[in-house]
Amino acid sequence: MKNAGPSQRQLRVGEQVRHAVAYKLQQGILLDDLLKNIVISVAEVRMSPDLKIATCFVSSLSTLHNVSPTDVVNVLNKHSRFIRREISYSLRQMKYMPELRFRLDTSFDNFSKIDSLLRSPEVARDLHHNDEFKD
């Protein structure tokens, strides 16, 4: 049963860390100039089996067109120790405060690609062709 997916504890702790990180980022604790006018969304947090590493998948909505999501992730990784300390106050029940690693969340991009493929004329034609055989 190796690689059976994350345990229930990993999922529960990951959700607690996600809430804490999202709340602190919403408060605007980082005073970096690059993060002004940027909304950061924490989509998911995956915990390592020993609960010592938390990989946070984030996406950003920028009102400035010259800020790339990769730059936002780099800034978050630069300030990860500060964010870790800030969330430690709300996660006191944890024996070890996990190391935070920020990664770009590409799930929305993947969804957009799949959606555009499903809406393509070739797929629509095939779906319409399959409906004729059902009758």
Swiss-Prot record:
Gene: rbfA
Protein name, UniProt field: Ribosome-binding factor A
GO molecular function, one term: ribosomal small subunit binding
Function description: One of several proteins that assist in the late maturation steps of the functional core of the 30S ribosomal subunit. Associates with free 30S ribosomal subunits (but not with 30S subunits that are part of 70S ribosomes or polysomes). Required for efficient processing of 16S rRNA. May interact with the 5'-terminal helix region of 16S rRNA.
InterPro entries from the UniProt entry: KH_dom-like_a/b (IPR015946), RbfA (IPR000238), RbfA_dom_sf (IPR023799), Ribosome-bd_factorA_CS (IPR020053)
Keywords: Cytoplasm, Ribosome biogenesis
Top-level taxonomic group: Bacteria
Subunit organization: Monomer. Binds 30S ribosomal subunits, but not 50S ribosomal subunits or 70S ribosomes.
Pfam families in UniProt: RBFA (PF02033)
One GO CC annotation: cytosol
Record bears the keyword Glycosyltransferase: no
Disulfide bonds: none
Cited PANTHER family: RIBOSOME-BINDING FACTOR A, CHLOROPLASTIC-RELATED (PTHR33515:SF1)
Entry keyword Ribonucleoprotein: no
Cellular compartments annotated: Cytoplasm
Family: Belongs to the RbfA family.
Biological processes, Gene Ontology terms: maturation of SSU-rRNA
